[in-house]
C-alpha cells in the first residue's frame, strides 16, 4: 500500500507542474512580427500566391480622361489635321508658324480645300510631328512665263476662290506653258523641308486648258535624291465638286545641297520651306479634352500618372510613361509575410512567438517583443530592425520605376494598302514586344517579392539570434519564438534585453540556481512520459499480486474451491 501511495505521489508531481512563466522567479520573453487580419496576395518565384501584410499595385489601369497641358506644350488640332495645317488649308490658317510638343488630332478633323492625297502620308506626318513646328520661310522662286496663284471654288478663302497658302498653283500664261527650271540652294546650317505637288486633271480637255501640253512632267531633285512624276489624267470620285486630284510630295534639302525643280506642266510649286528641327515632339489621335493640369504621361485616353512602372491603359503614349503590359494587376510586396494571429492561446492566455504566428495590433513597428513577468505582460516594437527592413524595401518601387519609365513616345503606325505585309509584320513585332515586356514585368515583380519576403524573414531571425546571444544560459529557447528566463526579470530587465544593454553575468548565478531548483521539480516531457508508463506498469503488477493473494487466501479458508481436471 505504501508503494501505491508513493507512485501516486510521483504521478501527481508529474502532472501537477506550474505553467511556465507563472513563477515570480522566472519570466517569458517572446519575439514576433507584425500581422494583419486580412493580408494581400502576391506572386513570388516559388509561390503563385503568398500572403503579405502590405503590397503596392504596380499597374496603372485608368486615365484621368483629359489631356494635361503641362509640362508638355499641347497643340489642339481642333478640326484640322497636321497635314492640312502644313499645306495651309484656309480653315487651318490659325496654325501657321505654331510649335508643339504634342499635336492632338481630333476625329472631327476635315479637309476643306482642293482634294489631295499624299503617297507617303505617314512618313510626312511623322516627320513634321517630330519637328514640332510649322515655322515657314517664304523664298523668292522665279516662275517665268506662267500664271501663278491659281485657285479653286473648292477651296474658299473668304468670299472668293483660294488655294493652299503654302503652295503655288502654276498654270499657262496666255497659250504657253514653258519648261520651268528653277534652282534653290540651301546656304543655311539646318535642313529645309519643301512641299510640292502634281495636279492630276480629270479630263484631257482640263489638262490642255490649264497646261497646254497633253501631258506634263514634274522632276524635283537634289544631290541625294530625284523624283519624277507623270500626271495621271482621269476622273475620280467627286469631292467638293471636283473629280481631279493633287498629289503632295516632299523633299528635304540638307545644308550645302541644292533643290532643282524642272517641269513642263502640272506643277504645284512650293512658296518656301519649313525649318526642320530635331526633337521628341509627336502627334496623337485623341478626343480627350485638354485641361489645365500637370502630367508627364499622355495617352489617347487621357493623361495618366507615372508613379507606377506599368500601365495597361493604351499602347500609344507620349512622355515619361510606364511601360505597357497586358496584365491588369501586378502587386509588389512592401510588407512581410503575413501570418494572422490565432484567436486562442491555450490555458491562461499564454503568449507565443513568431514561429507560431504574427501579432496583430503592433502598429509602431514590424518586429517586437512581448513579455510576461511578475509585473504582468507588455509589448514593445524593435525600431532598429523595423527601420532596417523598411529602408531596403522603400527603394524597391523607385528602382522598378527607374528601370521601366523612359522618356519616349510610342507613335501610331500607318501603312498604305500596298504595304499591308509590312503592317502585319510591324504588328507582329509590336505584339511580341508587349508579350516580352509583360513576361519581364511579371518576372521582375516576382523576383522583388521573393527578395522582400526573404529579407523580412531574415531580419526576424537576426533579432532572435541577437536576443539569444544576450541571454545565453540565463534562458531557454522554448521552440516557438519565446525564451524562458530563469531569473526574476522585471520591466527594466526586459527593456535592457530589448535595447541590447542586458548583462547576463549579473543574473547568471540566480539563473543557474533557479534552473537547478526548477529542473529538480519540473520533469521534462520525455522523462515524465517514462515515469508515467513505469508507474502504470508497477500499479498493474501490484494490483495483480493483490488479486492473486486474495484468491489464495480465500482458497485456504475454504471460501473458494478450485478443481483442476486433466
Swiss-Prot record:
Q: Where is this site: Cleavage?
A: 345-346
Record localization: Virion membrane; Host apical cell membrane
Q: Which residues are glycosylated?
A: 24, 38, 54, 97, 181, 301, 499
Q: Which residues lie on this side of the membrane: Cytoplasmic?
A: 552-566
What is its membrane topology? Answer: Single-pass type I membrane protein
Q: Where is the signal peptide?
A: 1-16
| Disulphide bond pairs | 30-482, 68-293, 80-92, 113-155, 297-321, 489-493
Q: Name one GO biological process term.
A: viral budding from plasma membrane
Q: Which Pfam families match?
A: Hemagglutinin (PF00509)
| GO terms assigned for molecular function | host cell surface receptor binding
Q: What PTM annotation applies here?
A: Palmitoylated. In natural infection, inactive HA is matured into HA1 and HA2 outside the cell by one or more trypsin-like, arginine-specific endoprotease secreted by the bronchial epithelial cells. One identified protease that may be involved in this process is secreted in lungs by club cells.
Q: Where is the lipid attached (S-palmitoyl cysteine)?
A: 555, 562, 565
Q: Give the keywords, sorted.
A: Clathrin- and caveolin-independent endocytosis of virus by host, Clathrin-mediated endocytosis of virus by host, Disulfide bond, Fusion of virus membrane with host endosomal membrane, Fusion of virus membrane with host membrane, Glycoprotein, Hemagglutinin, Host cell membrane, Host membrane, Host-virus interaction, Lipoprotein, Membrane, Palmitate, Signal, Transmembrane, Transmembrane helix, Viral attachment to host cell, Viral envelope protein, Viral penetration into host cytoplasm, Virion, Virus endocytosis by host, Virus entry into host cell
Give the transmembrane region(s).
531-551
Q: Might you report a single GO cellular component term? A: viral envelope
Q: Which residues lie on this side of the membrane: Extracellular?
A: 17-530
Top-level division of the source organism's lineage: Viruses
To which protein family does this belong?
A: Belongs to the influenza viruses hemagglutinin family.
Q: What's the subunit arrangement here?
A: Homotrimer of disulfide-linked HA1-HA2.
Instruction: List other remarks.
Output: Major glycoprotein, comprises over 80% of the envelope proteins present in virus particle. The extent of infection into host organism is determined by HA. Influenza viruses bud from the apical surface of polarized epithelial cells (e.g. bronchial epithelial cells) into lumen of lungs and are therefore usually pneumotropic. The reason is that HA is cleaved by tryptase clara which is restricted to lungs. However, HAs of H5 and H7 pantropic avian viruses subtypes can be cleaved by furin and subtilisin-type enzymes, allowing the virus to grow in other organs than lungs.
* Record's function text: Binds to sialic acid-containing receptors on the cell surface, bringing about the attachment of the virus particle to the cell. This attachment induces virion internalization either through clathrin-dependent endocytosis or through clathrin- and caveolin-independent pathway. Plays a major role in the determination of host range restriction and virulence. Class I viral fusion protein. Responsible for penetration of the virus into the cell cytoplasm by mediating the fusion of the membrane of the endocytosed virus particle with the endosomal membrane.
Protein name per Swiss-Prot or TrEMBL:
Hemagglutinin
Organism of this sequence: Influenza A virus (strain A/Hong Kong/1/1968 H3N2)
Gene transcribed to yield this protein:
HA
